[in-house]
């Protein structure tokens, strides 16, 4: 989002004294124009817990003189919590700042991680531009639930400015399933003709459920191959050809589209610290067979 240039006015009355005669002259009007424009964008439009967001701040000097020694301050998405606390949902990624002046990479300015994050000095030549690229990580104070967002404001200040310039970028919480899967075997030691179980745990850390219409599938090759399969999903028996297929010749096991569904994660925010906790939605697939 771009900050429009500040426009202000001043007036200067004139006085003339001639041999003890006081004359009021006309009043001259002048206009103060802010020659700095600022915009800020987020490369990634969405985030999940722990994600890194890349920000690009573009500053343009439309004046005829350089703007020297500017300070760029990023509020890292600060918001009020409770009666007096301020929380920061972003953590600056150390060493990520790059400064370009008219497209040329510059030595890294002084960076204070904060919060808030400050970058100084930034000098923009007359008619030129400066581009700052840096990263921040969504931390435990970033709302991961559906409808969550981080509103991030950058402020540019300095003696050469008629007023501070600001620009804003907003990223929203990802509203998709975030799946992880683990596999275990029981018992761990078996002999021929023993029964063995493979347990698959599906975890959904996302703010949206995995629906049957998403047509997610699991495939696995059992080696050694199994026979006389029995399959359950969340404790309910599955039927071969309806929820899964199994090739006894190759050991290939495949769930069929529409068979898998996993609840969305549950999100809670501590009333004491303001930190968010994610409890993943879970589903359990158990495949049992004879070696």
Pin down the residues of each PLM region.
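Exported/extracytosolic protein signature
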Residues: 1-291
């Amino acid at each position: 989002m771009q900050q429009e240039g500040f426009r202000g006015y001043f007036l200067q009355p004139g006085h003339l004294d001639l041999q003890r005669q006081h004359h009021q002259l006309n009043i001259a009007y002048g206009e103060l124009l802010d020659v700095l424009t600022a915009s800020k964008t987020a490369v990634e439009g969405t985030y999940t817990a722990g994600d890194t967001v890349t920000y690009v701040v573009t500053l343009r000097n439309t004046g005829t003189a350089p703007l020297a020694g500017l300070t760029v301050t990023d509020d890292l998405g600060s918001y009020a919590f409770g009666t007096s606390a301020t929380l920061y949902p972003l953590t600056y990624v150390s060493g990520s700042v790059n400064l370009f002046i008219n497209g040329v990479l510059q030595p890294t300015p002084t960076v204070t991680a904060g919060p808030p994050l400050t970058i100084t000095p930034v000098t923009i030549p007359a008619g030129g531009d400066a581009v700052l690229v840096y990263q921040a990580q969504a931390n435990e104070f970033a709302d991961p639930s559906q409808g969550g967002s981080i509103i991030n404001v950058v402020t540019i200040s300095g003696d050469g400015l008629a007023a501070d310039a600001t620009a804003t970028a907003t990223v929203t919480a990802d509203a998709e399933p975030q799946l992880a899967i683990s596999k275990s075997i029981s018992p761990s030691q078996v002999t021929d003709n023993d029964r063995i179980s493979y347990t698959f745990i599906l975890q959904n850390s996302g703010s949206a459920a995995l629906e049957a219409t998403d047509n997610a599938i699991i495939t696995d090759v059992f080696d050694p191959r199994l026979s006389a399969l029995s399959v359950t999903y969340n404790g309910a028996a599955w039927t071969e050809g309806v929820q899964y297929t199994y090739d006894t010749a190759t050991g290939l096991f495949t769930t069929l589209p529409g068979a898998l569904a996993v609840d969305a994660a549950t999100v809670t925010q501590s009333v004491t610290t303001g930190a968010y906790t994610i409890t993943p939605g879970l589903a359990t697939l158990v495949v049992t067979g004879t070696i």
